[in-house]
Regions:
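N-terminal secretory signal peptides that target proteins for export/translocation
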Residues: 1-12
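Bacterial N-terminal signal peptides
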Residues: 14-25
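Serine-esterase "nucleophile elbow" of acetyl-processing enzymes
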Residues: 32-120, 125-147
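Structural recognition of the beta-strand scaffold that forms the well-ordered cores
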Residues: 71-76, 113-118, 150-156, 160, ...
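Surface-exposed cleft-lining segments at the edges of enzyme active sites
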Residues: 114-119, 123, 157-172, 200-206
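Active-site segments of SGNH/GDSL-like serine hydrolases
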Residues: 153-161, 180-213, 236-242
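Charged helix-capping and loop-helix junction motifs
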Residues: 168-178, 209-214
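Catalytic His-Asp segment of secreted/periplasmic serine-dependent ester chemistry enzymes
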Residues: 199-280
């Protein structure tokens, strides 16, 4: 009898047969499961953030019984809007200003009860449309007679520095003047706190546009007829360091919007400013 030769394979025959079966099974195409009911098959109205935000403001304005308690109306773009947001919805881990907003303007003194009417992406022309009376074709967001604020806190114009109209300083300034005039026409008893534009992380934009616009609106607020109902609040130095550059510790990574610390600093400046305006 011839001696059996040991196999060089580490696997026994049954194991090899099983592995071969698995290999065949894996190489056999799996029939596709037919899926139905895709979103792509059905009509869907496109809804952007600004539309939802505008609807939310309109809903607050429809609550006429609550409007007499509003002493401050904040009007502007995303820099104003995001003061009442918590975590950045677009970038995880970044915080906006909800805590300081609640502390100062919701849970604070009744004289500082506020309505935030900022909408992300707004340019001066968009604010003009929102506050234009409904009878004139606008949204009428200052129409309600029950809304009778002591102050309207305004910051607008930075979005006009992108996709700008040239000459850019003149166009941004003209837009701010138009908003200022329209706000006063709608709420003539309110004092308007005209805030400076904040620095961006673009030093060229700051030097060529933001700083010159701020100088012009500061001068505007000091001259009649605007001085009778407008006061200028210069926030630019608060948000810059000793070299004049943007204080990055006060901004999220996009270099435009304040972070939680920036909003706290803004609140800590605005509240004493309001007190001084009430008690000159």
């Amino acid at each position: 009898m011839k001696p059996r030769h040991a196999s060089n394979s580490p696997f026994s025959l049954p194991v090899l047969q099983m592995l071969a079966f698995i290999a065949i099974a894996l190489s056999t195409p799996v029939p596709a499961v037919e899926k139905t009911g895709f979103n792509s098959e059905s009509p869907l109205r496109r809804v952007e953030y600004w539309q939802l935000r505008s609807e939310a403001i309109n809903a607050e304005l429809e609550n006429r019984a609550a409007l007499p308690a509003v002493k401050l109306v904040f009007l502007g773009d995303s820099i104003t809007d995001f003061w009442q947001l918590g975590e950045n919805p677009w970038v995880r881990g970044q915080q906006f200003g909800i805590d300081s907003w609640k502390l100062a303007f919701v849970e604070g003194l009744p004289e500082n009860r506020a309505l935030n009417m900022g909408i992300s992406g707004d340019r001066t022309e968009h604010v003009l449309y929102r506050i234009q009376p409904k009878a004139a074709g606008g949204l009428g967001q200052l129409d309600a007679p029950e809304l009778d604020p002591e102050f309207i806190v305004l910051m607008i114009g930075i979005n006009n520095t992108w996709a700008q109209e040239d000459p850019v300083v003149e166009s941004v300034f003209a837009g701010i003047v138009s908003v200022l005039n329209a706000v006063h026409a709608r709420k003539p008893k309110a004092r308007i706190i005209l805030q400076s534009l904040l620095p961006t992380n673009d030093e060229v934009r700051n030097g060529d546009v933001v700083v010159p616009v701020n100088a012009r609106i500061k001068d505007l607020a000091a001259r009649q007829p605007h001085a009778a109902y407008t006061v200028f609040l210069d926030l630019y130095p608060l948000f810059t360091d000793s070299t004049g550059k943007q204080k990055t510790a006060f901004f999220v990574t996009d270099g435009v919007h304040p972070n939680a610390a920036g909003y706290r600093a803004w609140s800590a400046t605005l509240l004493p400013f309001l007190r001084s305006e009430r008690n000159p």
